[in-house]
């Protein structure tokens, strides 16, 4: 893409004046409805031995090869304590249109309503996958830098490395790597804490011994004979 021929580097706000800083250990990426980009980072590479789960927001259209985070949300204390390299592996933004009345909100003990969160960033919910236990955690990221955990979903596949929301089937895909035979879980929100989960084995031809850690769904228009 134009201006991305050599890629762009994302940096923590604290490193804005220190271009030599190692920066975030970015593991996942998502884009909201306004085109802002969010990175999931499981540690600060300047302190590699410490787990530090954060989501960083950047404007991909900003000039320069370095993008300083416009906003940062630290999720570490709201997640299970894990080793440095077993933190969040993915982030997925889902519009409130797709989760209102469907996602269970543990704070209200009822179906989620974005109106209860007037400071919500990007009019949606951000889901992160934790490698250590395969759980998916949903958050509202507030525009003041705070965050609220909405729900905790166990994908029951052991580990989680990738997320992608299918807007056609209205399901959240959670995908594992070779440590769990590249199995996936399709999660459908039904307004209760007991979500609908369907497990999917890796398709034939996929090398389940390979360290596959990314996953994305094409639009339904790409389907052949399906």
Task: Give the label of every model feature segment.
Residues 1-226:
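Sequence/structural signature of beta-propeller domains
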């Amino acid at each position: 893409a134009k201006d991305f021929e050599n890629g762009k580097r994302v940096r923590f706000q604290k490193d804005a004046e220190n271009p030599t800083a190692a920066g975030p250990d970015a593991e996942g990426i998502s884009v909201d409805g306004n085109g802002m980009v969010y990175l999931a980072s499981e540690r600060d590479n300047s302190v590699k031995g410490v787990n530090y789960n954060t989501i960083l927001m950047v404007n991909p259209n900003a000039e320069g090869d370095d993008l300083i985070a416009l906003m940062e949300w630290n999720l570490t204390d709201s997640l299970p304590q894990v080793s440095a390299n077993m933190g969040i592996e993915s982030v997925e933004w889902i519009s409130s249109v797709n989760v209102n009345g469907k996602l269970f909100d543990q704070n209200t003990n009822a179906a989620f309503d974005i109106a209860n969160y007037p400071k919500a960033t990007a009019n949606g919910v951000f889901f992160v996958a934790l490698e250590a236990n395969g759980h998916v955690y949903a958050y509202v990221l507030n525009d003041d830098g705070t965050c609220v955990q909405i729900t905790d979903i166990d994908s029951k596949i052991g580990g989680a490395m990738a997320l992608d929301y299918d807007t056609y089937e209205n399901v959240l895909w959670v995908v594992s790597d070779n440590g769990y035979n590249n199995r996936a879980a399709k999660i459908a929100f039904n307004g209760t804490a007991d979500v609908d989960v369907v497990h999917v084995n890796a398709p034939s031809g996929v090398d389940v011994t390979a360290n596959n850690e990314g996953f994305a769904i094409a639009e339904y228009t790409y389907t052949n004979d399906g």
